[in-house]
């Protein structure tokens, strides 16, 4: 139980980092392939 507060405080930090990585990847993919978000691939 000693590591539980550290784990709970680490969760929001990891969430923010993961969402930042996902947003950055989505922006980069949208810059390289701008039509993928609006039209199907077929």
Curated annotation (Swiss-Prot):
Membrane topology (UniProt): Single-pass membrane protein
Gene3D superfamilies reported for this sequence: Single helix bin
Signal peptide: none
Chief location of this protein within or outside the cell: membrane
Entry's localization field: Cellular thylakoid membrane
Keyword Iron-sulfur: no
Residue spans crossing the bilayer: 7-27
UniProt keyword tRNA processing, yes or no: no
A Gene Ontology biological process term: photosynthesis
Swiss-Prot/TrEMBL keywords: Membrane, Photosynthesis, Photosystem I, Thylakoid, Transmembrane, Transmembrane helix
Cellular component, GO annotation: photosystem I; plasma membrane-derived thylakoid membrane
Superkingdom of source: Bacteria
Annotated family: Belongs to the PsaJ family.
HAMAP family per the UniProt record, alphabetical: PSI_PsaJ
Function, in words: May help in the organization of the PsaE and PsaF subunits.
Protein name: Photosystem I reaction center subunit IX
Gene: psaJ
């Amino acid at each position: 139980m000693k590591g539980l507060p550290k784990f709970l405080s680490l969760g929001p930090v990891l969430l923010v980092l993961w969402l930042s990585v996902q947003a950055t990847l989505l922006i980069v993919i949208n810059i390289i392939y701008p039509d993928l978000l609006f039209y199907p691939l077929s």
